[in-house]
Amino acid sequence: MDDTLAKLPRAFSGATVLVLGDVMLDRFVYGAVDRISPEAPVPVIAVERETTMLGGAGNVARNVAALGGRAVLVGVIGDDDAGRALTAMIDREPSLDSALIVDAKRRTTEKTRYISGSHQMLRADREDRGEADGVALLAAFNAHLREVDVVVLSDYAKGVLTPVVLRAAIAAANAAGKPVIVDPKSRDFSRYDGATLIKPNRREAAEATGVTGAGDEVAAEAADAILSTAPNLAAALITRGRAGMTLAVRGEAPVHLPATALEVFDVSGAGDTVAATLALALARGASPLDAARLANLAAGLVVAKLGTDVVTADELVGLAHGEHADPAVDKIADLDGALAIVAGWRARGLKVGFTNGCFDLLHPGHVSLLAQAKAACDRLIVGLNTDASVQRLKGPTRPVQKETGRATVLASLSAVDLVVLFDEQTPLNLIRAFRPDVLVKGADYTVETVVGSDVVLAYGGKVVLAQLKAGQSTTNLIGRMNAPAVGG
């Protein structure tokens, strides 16, 4: 990769992005389902916990901040609890400023997902789709336009980006010399005419143009149709999932960018990361092609993340330099980093499992245990004893492999999603911190003797005893290696 892409993210910290669009509160309600309602043939969810996140245009702004830029968010909320929750979350982001219009007659858009295990049972939307106060929105937009470098219009068809607001915002940005990126929702792409770049996904492009199918030629045809629909639109970037991206710049041949993900764990939030990266790159003078190439790298990073939907400038620099050669590195985290990852998993309703051990000289017994552990959950955390902890448990000659090597080997296994080192004699503190849904140990234990089983069972979790492979142990391996050779 050339130096241009590697240098761009370092300049993000001085860039400011104005995000105008539909701001939402995403709420997740988790619980257990173990019976059907006697009133109707529907499941009964016993609610256990709730989490909330910035959604819609708010998530684009959060991605800008995560990449090192500053975001100014313009949208509308109601005078209600959901609106106040959104404001509080924004206030906690130091690089995110808001100019939200509070409309007492309007409900804050709120999406509530009811989740049991790894299954979404129901989504309930509270929203007003009527037109928001365009005059107030444009006043807030124009008040901040001069201080920013680029504009993102995040359209979720909730009444903020009406045709009138779109035309006025694009015209004002053009007059001020600010690039405009559109993440569209309307099937009528002509309403985004005059923007610098439009970023539909494959489905949105097909619905807007009528061009359907797969492959590079189809994507190029769809991109050309988009530019024909909006004669003053400079470029179209169609995101195509595993097929990568297709960029069409007016007057130039289309360019197909293959997907860069080393491994795909979670695609949630990838579109917002792409929009934020495009905005920051264009703000720093990148060409549409270089901006798209960098956004493609960012998409590859974010879908390889475990339960998170943001990337950092440092990660982009490393990948652009070709330094991100080992995807296993992303699976090794300290406790704080791991807790953030696990929170992301839980926000998506994934069942979290935990097991632990020294894992010195990995053997088939270890692999079998880890495979059984992963089969019992959606995401598996492995607590790994540090070198000092192993030495206290096993004696001064252990471990054979240092903790860095042991962690890397574990992280390279597909069954393992996260590796966290611990220095104590037992993983009890990790178990209390992570609160796994499933705790797994070998069948040489009983449920009662598994460390942390009382904690997990007390909050309704499950303890699984994995079957062992006979004769497989690190101690036996070391003994055989140290035994004198027989014969000549």
From Swiss-Prot:
Its EC number is 2.7.1.167, 2.7.7.70. One of its GO terms (biological process) is ADP-L-glycero-beta-D-manno-heptose biosynthetic process. It comes from the Bacteria. Residues 354-488 are annotated as: Cytidylyltransferase. The active site is at 272. One of its GO terms (molecular function) is ATP binding. ATP binds at residues 201-204. Residues 1-327 are annotated as: Ribokinase. Keywords: ATP-binding, Carbohydrate metabolism, Kinase, Multifunctional enzyme, Nucleotide-binding, Nucleotidyltransferase, Transferase. It catalyses: D-glycero-beta-D-manno-heptose 7-phosphate + ATP = D-glycero-beta-D-manno-heptose 1,7-bisphosphate + ADP + H(+); D-glycero-beta-D-manno-heptose 1-phosphate + ATP + H(+) = ADP-D-glycero-beta-D-manno-heptose + diphosphate. SUPFAM superfamilies: Nucleotidylyl transferase, Ribokinase-like. The keyword ATP-binding applies. One of its GO terms (cellular component) is cytosol. PANTHER family: BIFUNCTIONAL PROTEIN HLDE (PTHR46969:SF1). Catalyzes the ADP transfer from ATP to D-glycero-beta-D-manno-heptose 1-phosphate, yielding ADP-D-glycero-beta-D-manno-heptose. This is Bifunctional protein HldE. It comes from Caulobacter sp. (strain K31). The gene is hldE.
